[in-house]
Regions:
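Cofactor-/ligand-binding subdomain signature composed of acidic, glycine-rich
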Residues: 1-52
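Hydrophobic alpha-helical positions that pack around
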Residues: 5, 140-266, 278
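Gly-rich Lys/Arg/Thr-decorated short loops/hinges at beta-loop-alpha junctions or inter-strand turns
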Residues: 26-33, 89-101, 204-210, 251-256
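Conserved phosphate/anionic-ligand binding catalytic regions in large, soluble enzymes, centered on
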Residues: 56-77, 174-188, 192-193, 348-360, ...
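Short acidic, glycine/serine/threonine-rich loops at helix termini
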Residues: 66, 71-74, 98-101, 140-145, ...
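Histidine-anchored nucleotide/phosphate-binding helix
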Residues: 108-122
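Short amphipathic, charge-patterned alpha-helical segments
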Residues: 115-119, 266-282
Length: 431
């Protein structure tokens, strides 16, 4: 049973403050105070490494899906050598079910900017890029405006806030490729190349953008940093689940009465998110299934959700992941064959084609699922689909093949009766 007190939580990422996207309003509500602190309060922050240590202690786990400790990632950057090094901020959210970063771009862009500036200072980085999906044209324009305002106020540029630290900040628009959300593919795109993932090692911290050390963080991840600097690591660790602390931006979509983005602590019960926060299943229907963290996270049946909370440890017990916390809710009338085909169609369309198991595997998955969907499938096709997923997973440069395989494997295994009934109906009608 969850002990997280989510009902009394006060938002810090998207608080209810009018016009918070404007720099003057942001400043009046404590904005950029954390940046001023790390630059000027030398007793508290004697050097950049002290900032890294505080963020590492807070255990801000990446909000882009992997869940890696952000401060630990920062610590992998080698010592500064006077040559360029980069921070690349990943705002290329393109996975079905995920739409939370755009809330920050729209509503509280300066929080993200401040977090990125603190991160850059902590790693002695002088150039920041934020990569935003091309379809987010309105949010790209908003970020351009916010960054220019920060330049005008002296938060970005030469010797910011009278310190000896200088930094530049650029917005880079994507061109509609989901694969560029993969960190090394994003680096290729930033360099003006086709978005092909790179073989690792070397990892970006050793050889990243233009061959120089680079750290890549998700937009929401960086947006947590100012509050950690202001309030301390222990404050952050006191919010939500013990091993996956802090608030999340939950993007809830599908068959609920109140879809949207909600900021709440990690560790909130899945059923509370659906029935209390999002207003329950629309039209009085029953809950059938939930994809908890974006389309790559394994689907869960309604009967698996009792006592399950939105954090890595809890979801792992039922064979799923928190991912990006982009929850897709499905009611009793949902056709799971159609859902799975649509997901597989997406991954086939978005595969870059560099690796054979992914290029060919995603195509076969979509083709066979379309056959079943159209009423021409056989029961043996289900085992063929499962076999194909085993030939894809762990055999490619990046994790897109895994992301395509997991939904197929788990949806078939958890809704096998529904798939078999469709296949048997096909055979019966053919006879």
């Amino acid at each position: 049973m969850s002990t997280v007190d989510w009902k009394n939580y006060e938002p810090v990422l998207i608080p209810d403050i009018k016009d918070l996207h404007k720099i003057d309003v942001y400043e009046k509500n404590g904005g950029y105070e954390a940046l001023k602190s790390v630059l000027k309060e030398k007793k508290k922050w004697p050097d950049p490494k002290s900032v890294v240590n505080e963020v590492k202690e807070a255990n801000i786990r990446g909000r882009g899906g992997a869940g890696f400790n952000a401060g630990l990632k920062w610590s992998f950057m080698p010592p500064a050598d006077g040559k360029p090094r980069y921070l690349a901020c990943n705002g290329d959210e393109s996975e079905p079910g995920t739409f939370k970063d755009r809330k920050l771009f729209e509503y509280n862009p300066h929080l993200f900017i401040e977090g990125a500036l603190i991160a850059a200072y902590a790693m002695e980085i002088t150039t920041i890029y934020v990569y935003i999906r091309g379809e987010y044209k309105v949010y790209i324009d908003m970020m351009d405006k916010a960054i220019q305002d920060a330049y005008d106020k002296g938060y970005i540029g030469k010797n910011i806030l009278g310190s000896d630290y200088s930094v530049d900040f650029y917005v880079h628009s994507g061109a509609g490729a989901y694969i560029c959300g993969e960190e090394t593919s994003m680096l290729e795109s930033l360099e003006g190349k086709r978005g092909y993932p790179r073989v690792k090692p070397p990892f970006p911290a050793q050889r990243g953008l233009w061959g120089r050390p680079t750290t890549i963080n998700n937009v929401e991840t960086l947006s947590h940093v100012p509050a950690v600097i202001k309030n301390g690591a222990d404050w952050f660790k006191g919010i939500g689940a013990e091993n996956h602390p802090g608030p999340f931006l939950y993007g809830i979509s599908g068959h609920v009465n109140r879809p949207g983005v909600y900021e709440l602590p990690s560790g909130i019960p899945v059923l509370d998110l659906i029935h209390e926060v999002a207003g329950g299943i629309r039209n009085g229907k029953k809950l059938k299934a939930v994809i908890p963290g974006g389309s790559s996270t394994p689907v869960l049946r309604a009967d698996q959700l009792d006592g399950i909370t939105m954090d890595a440890d809890s979801l792992r017990t039922v064979g799923s992941m928190v991912g990006t916390a982009g929850m897709v809710v499905m009611d009793e009338d949902t056709d799971m064959i159609d859902v799975l085909w649509r997901i597989s169609h997406f991954y086939h369309h978005e595969s870059c084609g560099q690796c054979t198991p992914c290029r060919e595997g995603t195509g076969w998955l979509e083709k066979i699922l379309l056959k079943i969907k159209n009423g021409d499938g056989e029961v043996k096709d289900l085992d063929l689909l499962l076999d194909i997923t085993t030939q894809m997973e762990g055999r490619t440069i990046c994790a897109l093949a895994d992301a395509a395989a997991w939904p197929v494997r788990h949806t078939i295994n958890r809704f096998r009766d529904e798939f078999e009934a469709r296949c048997k109906k096909s055979v019966h009608e053919l006879a």
